[in-house]
């Protein structure tokens, strides 16, 4: 190949082997929405598609702006626990936290989302209980989310998210791949969940 593109330190070994073999390699390490947009711009430059990349970025930025404007109408923000893995339990990576905020929610563990390594985002069942999420979103990377398993955890039956049926799945392909899909698919699903929660709250008044 003329160029190999990879992502994160997880591909460091194979990248090193390719470099030693004389292959040109570019490894991205995007963890935020702004870094994802920059990755698209750089990829466009690397493959001679700068204009197409700029058009895609403009489309994605429009989606982000529309989500931001829609969320500005909400007077209350639900607390959202995003679970990336179940054993051990891992909370949201930075871009997932940012998407939750954009859609009008508050991430339960924003202080952990900035950590690059998943092991630094491990949480306990008790910590989640203490944060009292209104919404639980599961996106177990590479395997099917099991809401019944989540709801059966000790003391989770008393959580608002469980009592009111706001334990939901977003497919990992839609939100955990660090590219356009987390905006075109992931964000829109988070918006739909939060908008449903807002309607539910309005009915309680």
Regions found by a protein language model. Give the residues of each.
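Helix-loop "lid/cap" segments that line or gate small-molecule binding pockets
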Residues: 40-48
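Residues in soluble alpha-helical coiled-coils and helical-bundle/repeat scaffolds
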Residues: 9, 48-51
